[in-house]
Design a protein with these regions (language model features):
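Alpha-helix capping and helix-loop boundary segments enriched in small/acidic/polar residues
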Residues: 105, 110-113, 157-164, 168, ...
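Conserved helix-loop functional segments at active or binding sites
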Residues: 146, 183-186, 190, 219-226, ...
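Acidic, glycine-rich loop-and-beta core segments that form the ion-binding/anion-interacting portion
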Residues: 217-305
Length: 446
């Protein structure tokens, strides 16, 4: 059995070990690649300040690249008896390089090691979320333009209210995603700061060069105060969780609309049969399970900030093992959101729109506001026009004019999709993912 990094001359009770290690062997697999990257930057810095020999650094870097390749292929395993990813990487180095492998922990604690792992992992996952959001955004804009002239009922209180259009409906969710991207950008900026060198939260007596590791890992800056660097554990996850929940909120609302509009009582949209599921007893059923699951998964993701906050709610300054539990809800959340985004983009692309909804006379009353406005424009006081049209509706005498003219910004006739796209592009341009990507490629020699 591997010796623990903190092991002394006594053996820990097996049940205590099981309870305290928890799911780390499983969850730390998410962090394996990033633990290697952090170690590569750290030992490069150690060599520069004389804590590693010039002949040792190339050997350690070469072996770390081998471990990275193993993790990249999904073959990295944390062995029984090994507590976490940090211990496993050090064990693998020591098995290959002997005592040289034991030197990589100089000037470092598992506290700042897991902090940098989490930040490297999170910024990579945020980029993938951003990419997936943009794909869905593009699908929505395309559909909005394609069906910009197809009218549909707009609702308030789930009652037919005023004319809307599929151009507005698809475009509304596109603009919502453009706003959501601002939350993702803020989360990325707060994440992309280097905690490495803060050690256990109080720094080190070694002359560490934190600026160097910041540059090597492609961080925008560092978490300067070493106490705050440790305080940031949990806070970073909470901030990112809010961004995830914001995107999930858009998806959940859109999925509810799609389920409702797809049912026979509405019949506004139709899903291809290959995108639906059936019933074991009712042969006619074509169920929108994809949207139902997007809704449920997105609602679950909206609880993520509360889960993180409750775990860290009453913790004072410093590291506590409570923070380990955050990984259980935080690390898998990215995959869940990406899955929902990808499925939403796929199904929106396949969605068919009913272009003859308003042929049904049940929707005639929604043109009442248009009639009131026309009377008011022709000189009738608004309240008198309102009363006149209301009486016509009550008497069953209302004859709608369905030729509507909405021209102001953001209305049926002037969607402003170009402006919405501009909002999205402006936000995307401020992420600067290339700094992260170039730094990681350089570390790996790619």
């Amino acid at each position: 059995m591997a010796q623990k990094l903190w092991e002394k001359n006594f053996e820990v009770n097996k049940e205590i070990e099981r309870f305290t290690v928890g799911r780390d062997r499983e969850l730390d697999l998410y962090l394996a690649k990033y633990d290697v990257l952090g170690s590569m930057a750290h030992i490069t810095m150690l060599e520069s300040i004389g804590l590693l020999g010039k002949e040792e650094l190339p050997q350690l870097l070469a072996e770390l690249k081998n471990i990275y390749a193993i993790a990249e292929k999904g073959e990295f395993v944390i062995e029984d008896g090994v507590e976490d990813v940090h211990s496993q990487v050090e064990l693998m180095l020591t098995q290959k390089l002997g005592d040289m492998g034991k030197k990589i922990h100089s000037g470092r604690s598992r506290n700042d090691q897991v902090l940098v792992d989490l930040k490297l992992f999170t910024r990579h996952e945020l980029k993938e979320i951003v990419d997936a959001v943009k794909i869905l955004f593009d699908e929505l804009i395309q559909k909005s333009e394609q069906y910009k002239n197809v009218l549909m009922p707009g609702y308030t209180h789930l009652q037919v209210a005023m004319p809307s259009s599929f151009g507005l409906w698809f475009g509304a969710y596109a603009e919502s995603l453009a706003d959501d991207m601002l939350f993702l950008q803020a989360a990325y900026r707060m994440t992309n700061r280097n905690p490495l060198g803060s050690a256990a939260g109080y720094g080190s007596s070694f002359p560490l060069n934190r600026t160097m590791t910041t540059q090597l890992l492609g961080f925008d800056s560092m978490d300067y105060n070493v106490v705050y660097a440790q305080m940031g554990r949990g806070k970073m996850e909470r901030n990112v969780a809010f961004a995830i929940a914001t995107v999930a909120g858009t998806l959940a609302k859109m999925a509810f609309d799609a389920c409702m509009f797809n049912c026979q009582n509405f019949g506004f949209v139709k899903l291809p049969k290959e995108c639906t599921t059936g019933s074991s007893i009712m042969p006619h059923k074509k169920n929108p399970d994809v949207f139902e699951l997007i809704r449920a998964k997105s609602n679950k993701l909206q609880s993520l900030p509360q889960q993180v906050m409750i775990i860290m709610n009453n913790l004072p300054v410093g590291y506590f093992r409570d923070l380990q539990i955050i990984k259980e809800v935080f690390l898998p959340a990215f995959g869940e959101l990406k899955d929902c985004l990808q499925m939403a983009a796929y199904i929106i692309n396949k969605m068919e729109v009913n272009e003859h909804i308003l042929d049904d006379p049940r929707y005639d009353p929604m043109f009442s506001v248009e009639e009131v406005n026309q009377l008011a424009a022709n000189g009738t006081p608004f309240r008198d026009a309102y009363k006149k049209v209301g009486l016509e509706i009550e008497a069953g005498e209302f004859k709608p004019n369905k030729d509507i003219h909405h021209t102001h910004e953001g209305s049926i006739g002037n969607l402003c999709n170009d402006k919405i796209q501009e909002l999205m592009e402006n936000t995307l341009s401020e992420f600067h993912f290339e700094r992260m990507e170039n730094a990681e490629k350089e570390l790996l020699g790619r």
